[in-house]
Structure formats: structure tokens, C-alpha cells
Amino acid sequence: MNISKLPPLSPSVIRRILFYLLMLLFCQQLAMIFWRIGLPDNAPVSSVQITPAQARQQPVTLNDFTLFGVSPEKNKAGALDASQMSNLPPSTLNLSLTGVMAGDDDSRSIAIISKDNEQFSRGVNEEVPGYNAKIVSIRPDRVVLQYQGRYEVLGLYSQEDSGSDGVPGAQVNEQLQQRASTTMSDYVSFSPIMNDNKLQGYRLNPGPKSDSFYRVGLQDNDMAVALNGLDLRDAEQAKKAMERMADVHNFTLTVERDGQRQDIYMEFGGDE
């Protein structure tokens, strides 16, 4: 078996190879020198820390979705406008609204609600008697209730329908008219007077039956400070006064006019 040998390299080829190797080493050293000259001695060396990418979005949970819409708490009852108020359905609860002290500030307004011949005074965000429902707004002639996820309106003497207790509709209407004619709200309207977030009394103005209002000596915008001896400037006493109004047919109002106080006696009821 013949093995061919490579011809020996000539001296000129060897010199050329050595020259290229030396030039390569020289260029490498020269590059390192220029790199060190160009870089400042105190230049901070930046370090890069690679961390796993974090999700930009919050994880989706089942609580983010609602099957039947948003509850009234999230919609805020205070956001109800006049058009929504007029379109609310009447309440189906077995309650009657027998009196209202309503003003611009809902937190100072009081509603008198009757259930099973008992009177209860309630304010905004307070639960009505006998039901897991609360008052979200008090108006001069109605209150707005939040019950089982929806809003309902409880109007003055509007909850007794013709089918209750088996009483014929005509008889119920007659009873309602007689009862409505003896409510204080028909003669006097109350609205809170606030000063520095303190209740000063209630502004009086005539109700639908204004003749009786003026006949007893009351004047527009009189300020009532007491009702039947109960101080209307005290929230608890004011509630008690409102509760008793539905059971009496006469009362004494203490009004403050031009810095002077005077008691005005008023009797209502019957066909007056």
C-alpha cells in the first residue's frame, strides 16, 4: 500500500503563515489597548437582572361577572334622577306611609311608616319594620325603598289596595279619603332648617288644605322648634313627634318668628 506524502512547505510559505499569525495577535492587543483607554476608570458597570415577565392584567375571577346585572348598592341610590323616580313601581310591601318631614338634605328627613297599626319613624338608609328593605330617599309625598335588589315607591296612603281584608273597593276608597283628610301633611309641610350642619328647626309651609294653615295663625316659612312639647331640633324627639302625629287630631306647634316664640294650637280632621 503506497502512502503519498505531502510535499514539504517552502520557507517562504512558512514565513507568510507566521507573519499572518503575528499580525492577528498584534491587532488583538491593539484593540484591547484602545478599549481600555476609551473606557473611564470609574464607569459603573450596569448589571442586567432578568426576571420572569409579570402579567399586566389582573386575573379574572368569577366575582367580576354578574348574571343579573349590578346591584343598587353599586349604582348608588342617590344617583336616581327625576325621570327614574317617576318610573319606579309602587311597593308591594304591607306598609303605609303616614307622614313625612322632607327637606333638601335626605339625611335629615324623617318618614313615618305604619305596619300592623303601629307607627315607626325611619330615616334614609334605615330598614323599614318587618322587611329586609331600607329607605334610600325621602320625598314630600313618597319614599323610595330598596327591596330584593330593586327600587320601589311607597306613597302617602297608596299601599292599601281594594283587595285587602276582603273590603270592597268603594269602601276602601272612602276609608282612604277619610284617613287622608285627617293627616297633618294635608295642612302643614315640614322641611329641615340647617345651620353649620346643625338642625335649627323645621320650616313650615301650607299643605294642600292651605285655608286651615293660615286660619290658625301660621305664616309662610315659620320655623317650628317644638311639636306637642317635643323639641324638633333633637333628632330622637323629632322622630317621636312624627310617630305620634298619626294618632292625634290636634297638636300644638311652637314656632319662632322674628326672634319670638309662640304656641299655635291646631286641630284637624273631619271634613275640614
Swiss-Prot record:
GO BP field: protein processing; protein secretion by the type II secretion system
Physiological role: Involved in a type II secretion system (T2SS, formerly general secretion pathway, GSP) for the export of proteins. Required for the translocation of the multiple pectic enzymes.
Presence of the UniProt keyword Ribosomal protein in the record: no
Periplasmic side: 36-272
GO cellular component: plasma membrane; type II protein secretion system complex
Side Cytoplasmic, residues: 1-16
Family the entry assigns: Belongs to the GSP C family.
Subcellular location: Cell inner membrane
Primary gene name: outC
One Pfam family named in its UniProt record: T2SSC
Parts of the chain that traverse the membrane: 17-35
Keywords assigned by UniProt, alphabetized: Cell inner membrane, Cell membrane, Membrane, Protein transport, Transmembrane, Transmembrane helix, Transport
UniProt name for this protein: Type II secretion system protein C
Entry keyword Transferase: no
Organism this protein belongs to: Dickeya dadantii (strain 3937) (Erwinia chrysanthemi (strain 3937))
InterPro entries listed in its UniProt record: PDZ_sf, T2SS_GspC_N, T2SS_protein-GspC
